[in-house]
């Protein structure tokens, strides 16, 4: 490839030119004479001219594109190294190259010409590229490696040319002047040299290209690379002249990557060609890739012998010259070039790339490469191996330990010198050993490793303005010098020595001048670099990128988990200034990076690498930042990361693993500074809320969550309340944390919460006070809720509770974004303490937040399906069901108590009805999934019972009759646990029997509001057994139960379905239906109704929502009073809840009645809570298990019929209060009628629901492990059989459950109730086990489910149930 030869030729020409520039005409004459001898046999012709002072300069958009895009792309290609310098016919032993190739050309020459505005139009440049490729094809055989490399480059070249701007327009050469000094100097320096080279150059470039085929074995490259250094030195003198500097400046930047490759092909190093090498070393950096070398090492082996050039004096001069050339382009280059003054700068500049070099060397020493790297670890032991001729053949031995020691001693100025020594080591091996020797094969393997890593080394910035770019330039100088001496043969060494001697004096003078120039350039660069750092463009881009940044940051958080990849050299200069103040934690050095890259290297050294946890937290914090701050984040990254500098901020994709530690630390500082500002106001808000509520549990949870999120949570809630940005990335995690905190608080505070309930609503546990506070301002709490939800549970819960029924509604919508905060705030204040008793409930607890969120969104669905009033209750029910889900018996009572005590409750119920309706529907879908997951996790029987009880309350929403049944459940539930039983009676005492009945229905409806849609879906749970036990509230509740019985029957089938939870929705629905029928028959007894309701509640906490809506309509007033809710009774101090509830209920009961008459209000469910305090405990126990299954079955299809029934019976609640028996009768009748209607509706709706549930289940299955899917395919047939068997088993279970429910109803006495919880727990455990088994089977069969077969099975099963 002529390109390869090009670099070599260029090096020689440069020395010649350098000599002439130095003002030693003799040197130029010698150079000219040398080229001729090269042509004759031993010398290379001068390189093609790259600048002509007599020729007008011109810059066009196409030429600019060729330099910045086409040439830059080709230069970085792994096959480009042979074409980066003129062909060194001497070094490669190609005496006939320049005889065959009359017009040599290489990319190094083209690059210089483009940088010097040598071309008049783009066509001339394209012609040079074509000449380079043609020379390679002419001189080399078609199958040679070099030809294949040239073809690959040509293909890429043609692809880039297709994108060339169509119209060529001239551009002012202002920038050229900026680089100008060096360029002008180069032009002046080269004029004399160029005149001679012009004639020879034509021949030389072709020669350069052709030899490349031979050099392809990079083995020789190490030596040639050193040769490059001498070339740089020669150019340095040129730089002193002034014209040379410009020339060097442009080449050094591209050459940096290439220097290693360039030297390899440059046998010319024996000549002053070292000069040519300078630009190439810089360029070669990327171009030199070992892959190319490995392909042709055998051909180069003989050629690489010359790399051992004796003239090391050249290297010293060359190093100085190269320094001068570098200063011309970037200040950093200048500093390294002047070894005396710039030496310190050099070390800092080189640091980034030399760090990479150190990493490459470490990898080469790694054990994984030891099998083929061991021969290169130490110097060749000539005596031990008996290699007496080794020193004669290998003039410059090299080994990895020597390279390591030089690297540690900072003897390498840049990566190019390092690469030259490594390649010298390999070339020595190829040169001394025969091609088929095993050591050669080992060298090629190791060189492949080296070249791959070396090619990936981050490029030094090529922009002259940026100081960072300079580091790349100096490295080549060092590397070039040693290789040049080794590469040049002994014959050429004498010539080069003479030329170097002549120019040494001049070099010393030039060095002084260059150092002064470097100082001036550095000052200019510093001035330029600062504006770049503050460039507004990047800020604007950053602003645009803000949105994308948020989403990408989230992805990055996941990516951060991956092991850290190489970090590109830091580009801190631009962003450091702006980001330093903001990012206090990131890196102290970022500010330094601004002015010079050297600081960056130091900073990089000082920077502590980020741990995975730190990166994850950083990504979370970045997601919290508002949009206006993200722009700055992008700016910081772009300014510090060369690879992302030119990326489009709107589409930037950032992988934390690829970012430098300094960049990450700078980001950390900035984000921390931004978040601190936000946190202060947020903290104030939290304090205000905490002070008002003074909730210990919430405060503890808040502190925990804040600590966990590292203050990111508070910021998120505060700043992103409006933007909702935190909700996207951080919220999920924060919410989880909050849930954990709530669970912990509930576990720790279960006793305290009961204690708090003793104080009436005003003094409930810390959570209750917030509720009270929020009650007066129901509207404000909703807004505060979202803010405080994530950061501090304290503040958010009080608003929810304070709102009571009305507040709950606004909060629910607000909580859609902050599900956890809202859920815990309104409902969980008391429930949280309850959760601890039942460990499995935490899953439910987490579920409630989601339910609440969904409730906020889904209430519209409830509105559509049910009357507005019922839907509102369901909304509230959505909030309440989380309480049952949590085993906090005391907390529910407390929460309800505060709500009940307030007289506004009567009015709030209406508000709640309106506001809460929308929330309920969403809860159903989310709750279904959450409960299913929780059920699996929380299989403990105890949790299941409580959950069932809680859910049993929701079932009442089905038809108006269910409200009485809900009351029965509440009363009956207390009996199942011995302690709860006493609680219901005190509540009844406080409240007249009729009123308690109303209150209980209200509470149930509140809880059931979520379940109503699931009624059809709710699977029967053992809870029915427990539900019947509560006999104490028998009188008032009996009436309600009679009405509810029909619904309870329905709910039972649903609970059965839940047991099946794993099976398709249809199966769940059908069992529910069957249970409803059986329950309907059994419903006349209160006990039957209660078990069914409990099942419903347990089966689907979410489903209860629709049920609650229906119930509430019928029992408007009672439901409104349901605030106390059964969960509160569960707590250890049921007496307190009862007392609190009783006073609250007494004053509010009248209010409740009017609300009921006016419209069905949802608040009554809260009133129900006080009597069911005891039952709540059981329910909570059951809930954990059942809630999981119920989630799937949350559907509102039956809501329409329920709503109609509710509307018909809105007045029944008041009548119930007057005559509990009459109201129960009415409810039972309505329930029975609804059951009949619902059966027809269910037949139709269940088909759609089954399909929907199937889709849900399929989605869940698709998420299951792939292994399970593979197994599923194998066991597809078995799975079908299992399903059939399971369906039969479920049917049997449903029948058994129905029987159990009847038995429980029969055992209305407290003894029966106490015995029921155990049987219920056993049943629930069995159900949970079966569900888990079914879930696993479904997972296994997920990929092979036959939907037609499934539908048939479901239809058959449904028929059997009904």
From Swiss-Prot:
Keyword terms: Acetylation, Bromodomain, Chromatin regulator, Chromosomal rearrangement, Chromosome, Disease variant, DNA damage, Host-virus interaction, Intellectual disability, Isopeptide bond, Nucleus, Phosphoprotein, Repeat, Transcription, Transcription regulation, Ubl conjugation
Modified residues (Phosphoserine): 470, 484, 488, 492, 494, 498-499, 503, 601, 1117, 1126, 1201, 1204
Location of cross-link Glycyl lysine isopeptide (Lys-Gly) (interchain with G-Cter in SUMO2): 99, 585, 645, 694, 1050, 1111, 1197
UniProt keyword Transcription present: yes
NPS region: region residues: 484-503
Cross-link (Glycyl lysine isopeptide (Lys-Gly) (interchain with G-Cter in SUMO1)): 1111
Domain writeup: The NET domain mediates interaction with a number of chromatin proteins involved in transcription regulation (NSD3, JMJD6, CHD4, GLTSCR1 and ATAD5). The C-terminal (CTD) region mediates interaction and recruitment of CDK9 and CCNT1 subunits of the P-TEFb complex. It is also required for maintenance of higher-order chromatin structure.
Physiological role: Chromatin reader protein that recognizes and binds acetylated histones and plays a key role in transmission of epigenetic memory across cell divisions and transcription regulation. Remains associated with acetylated chromatin throughout the entire cell cycle and provides epigenetic memory for postmitotic G1 gene transcription by preserving acetylated chromatin status and maintaining high-order chromatin structure. During interphase, plays a key role in regulating the transcription of signal-inducible genes by associating with the P-TEFb complex and recruiting it to promoters.
Protein name according to UniProt: Bromodomain-containing protein 4
Organism listed in the record: Homo sapiens (Human)
Lineage: Eukaryota, Metazoa, Chordata, Craniata, Vertebrata
